[in-house]
A protein has these predicted regions:
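Beta-sheet ligand-binding and adhesion/scaffold domains
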Residues: 25-27, 35-80, 90-98, 104-192
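Bacterial N-terminal signal peptides that target proteins for export
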Residues: 1-7
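Amphipathic alpha-helical packing elements
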Residues: 228-270
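Compact alpha-helical subdomains of small soluble proteins
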Residues: 252, 259-305
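Sec/Tat-exported extracytoplasmic proteins
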Residues: 57, 241-244, 248, 293-296
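C-terminal motif of bacterial Sec signal peptides marking the signal peptidase cleavage site
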Residues: 15-18
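Acidic/histidine-rich, surface-exposed loop or edge segments in extracytoplasmic proteins
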Residues: 214-226, 268-272
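Surface-exposed intrinsically disordered loops and tails
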Residues: 66, 77, 185, 189-211, ...
Length: 305
């Protein structure tokens, strides 16, 4: 009798365990089904609007000249809006200004062909774009979320669609301005009055300038040697190096480099990190250029503007 009771209890335990397994398996299947539904991407629409739109980003700011009082004037910057994905309910992409890349999410109105695009909001420079599409151009405005945190809380923009394509042959054109206007340096100069013979010392502001070597040396195409670089100016080396990154669409934070490459019609900033896109020869050349930049010197001169 005892054996019979023991067998009955054992069978009951097995039955309960089996039910629990079935329940767990059913729940797991339901969860997996739910996960699959959540991960199914919404269908994309209007892929013809995908791409980079570049152009002027203008707003009024207080400008402080070297001489005279501050005044309010128009300040123009270069803006890139990159539209990556459009669905029925959402638009995804990123904005790039002054090398600062911010994601955005918004909506597209098919009836008016207009976008409302919001940056995340946790950076002081974040805001909302309200733009209208007209063929291959975007026009509209931007408003900062925190109007007291930025110099120009309201801006207008006029952008044209640009195709980004990496090309190792891209170079600065030979009519490019090679002066670094962003980093002037003061030098002590002497002046002798011809009438009195008295010599006086004064401070003169000078800017560094690159040489024509930047039009000839291409670190994306040729394997550089120490002989190629040993007599170059520091600014030469910096331009040759950063031309590599510009060809890959790097968004420069330093105004100096933006000034040089925005003179071209091929520079399209699309990312704030292109390290993984560099070719083996580019990586080797950048490493060599960095070594020479560390010890190179610049040539300064006086220039009117």
């Amino acid at each position: 009798m005892k054996n019979l009771k023991f067998i009955s209890a054992f069978l009951l335990v097995l039955a309960l365990a089996s039910c629990k397994k079935e329940s767990t398996a059913t729940a797991s299947m339901q969860n997996n089904s739910s996960d699959k539904k959540d991960t199914v991407a919404a269908p994309e629409i209007h892929k013809e609007y995908y791409g980079v739109y570049m152009g002027d980003f203008a707003g009024k700011e207080m400008i402080t000249p070297e001489i005279g009082e501050a005044y309010e004037g128009d300040v123009y910057k270069r803006l890139s809006l990159k539209i990556n994905r459009i669905t029925k309910d959402s638009v995804y992409g990123q904005s790039i200004v002054n090398g600062n890349q911010r994601p955005f999410r918004g909506i597209f109105n098919e009836a008016t062909k207009s976008f409302i695009l919001d940056e995340p909001g946790h950076d002081k420079s974040d805001g909302r774009f309200e733009v209208k599409l007209n063929n291959d151009s975007l026009t509209g405005k931007w408003s900062a979320f925190n109007t007291s945190a930025v110099k120009s809380p309201h801006k207008v923009l006029k952008l044209a669609k640009k195709e980004f394509a990496y090309n190792p042959n891209f170079m600065l054109s030979e009519n490019s301005d090679l002066i670094d206007w962003e980093n002037p340096k003061d030098f002590a100069e002497k002046y002798t009055d011809e009438e009195t013979g008295k010599t006086e010392t004064y401070m003169a502001s000078k800017n560094r300038i690159a040489s024509g070597a930047v039009f000839k040396i291409n670190a994306s195409r040729q394997k550089l040697t120490e002989k190629d670089l040993k007599n170059l100016r520091k600014l030469d080396l910096e331009i040759i190096k950063n031309a590599v990154f510009a060809r890959h669409g790097y968004a420069f934070k330093k105004q100096t480099y933006r000034n040089f490459f925005e003179q071209t019609d091929w520079y399209v900033p699309v990312s704030n990190n292109v390290d993984n896109d560099l070719t083996p020869i580019e990586k080797e050349n950048v490493a060599l250029l960095n070594r020479f930049i560390k010890y190179a010197e610049d040539k300064y001169d006086s220039f009117g503007r």
